Amino acid sequence: MSAGMPINPKPFLNGLTGKPVLVKLKWGQEYKGFLVSVDGYMNMQLANTEEVIEGSVTGNLGEVLIRCNNVLYIKGMEDDDEEGEMRD
């Protein structure tokens, strides 16, 4: 197994701002949406958020604020993976 280079999380998250992301919480929930902003504590604001359970979308939540200590991971999604565009 090869070790990857460590990534500073703040520039990584700032680079994802305005892009579609998938956020998985420690408790198993997954949310897809557009990352609107990240604060100094790494709390995240998502727009056009959808809840994903077992790979399928179960509901549209709209705008969501996720507290930093609940996040297991966040990953950027390809434009092909996310339908629609960011709306205000």
UniProtKB/Swiss-Prot annotation:
Keyword Ribonucleoprotein in record: yes
GO biological process: mRNA splicing, via spliceosome
Family annotation (SUPFAM superfamilies): Sm-like ribonucleoproteins (SSF50182)
UniProt cross-references to SMART domains, sorted A to Z: Sm
InterPro entries, alphabetized: Lsm6/sSmF (IPR016487), LSM_dom_sf (IPR010920), Sm (IPR047575), Sm_dom_euk/arc (IPR001163), Sm_F (IPR034100)
Domain of life: Eukaryota
Residues of the Sm domain: 8-80
Subcellular location: Nucleus; Cytoplasm, Cytosol
Main location: nucleus
Listed GO MF terms: RNA binding
Gene Ontology, cellular component aspect: catalytic step 2 spliceosome; cytosol; pICln-Sm protein complex; precatalytic spliceosome; small nuclear ribonucleoprotein complex; spliceosomal complex; U1 snRNP
Gene3D superfamilies, alphabetized: 2.30.30.100
Disulfide bonds: none
Keywords: Cytoplasm, mRNA processing, mRNA splicing, Nucleus, Ribonucleoprotein, RNA-binding, Spliceosome
The family this protein is said to belong to: Belongs to the snRNP Sm proteins family. SmF/LSm6 subfamily.
Record text on subunit structure and interactions: Interacts with the SMN complex.
Free-text function comment from the UniProt entry: Plays a role in pre-mRNA splicing as a core component of the spliceosomal U1, U2, U4 and U5 small nuclear ribonucleoproteins (snRNPs), the building blocks of the spliceosome.
Protein's recorded name: Small nuclear ribonucleoprotein F
Gene: SmF
